[in-house]
């Protein structure tokens, strides 16, 4: 029996997520180069993975709650249902891992395990999480980027602020993606060279359009 479609609380946010994916996925691939496999943790209906598939990615996996199943825009065989607030499945290796605006929905004590799982799954992680003042439905763990940067650094992953310079002024992309999204990469990861990157002292950079949305 399918889960009740009404039970998934973020269904109204999916159209905006789809628009963002259409704009941002090509930019991600311009930074990473071609990838064959992508896992998305907390990816809702699979909208971001669908765009990656449209760009030639062969293997995708969505990890999210079972309530997303009636809303999927990718084949249901790509969903691994999981209560992210309690546990994650055994990690598998992918070329790229996504975790976008998911971490703030999880209890604070899950943060370390989430980052460990992501870094065990891929050498390149595209990550965003809500910041204090952002507001939003079901947000229980709001942190500034340096909190997450420290957790990734413990795992040997360096922050590359190469995505925000390309999307921060794009109003077709929801402001939280423009503000919060970073690339984290292991020492062995290969990113395309010549990327524009915000300087470390701009780590908390908030675009004037985005500042208007903070509470």
Describe each PLM feature range.
Residues 1-98, 109-121, 135, 141-151, ...:
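Conserved N-terminal segment of class I S-adenosyl-L-methionine
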Residues 105-106:
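A short His-aromatic
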Residues 122-132:
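Conserved beta-strand signature within the Rossmann-like core of class I S-adenosyl-L-methionine
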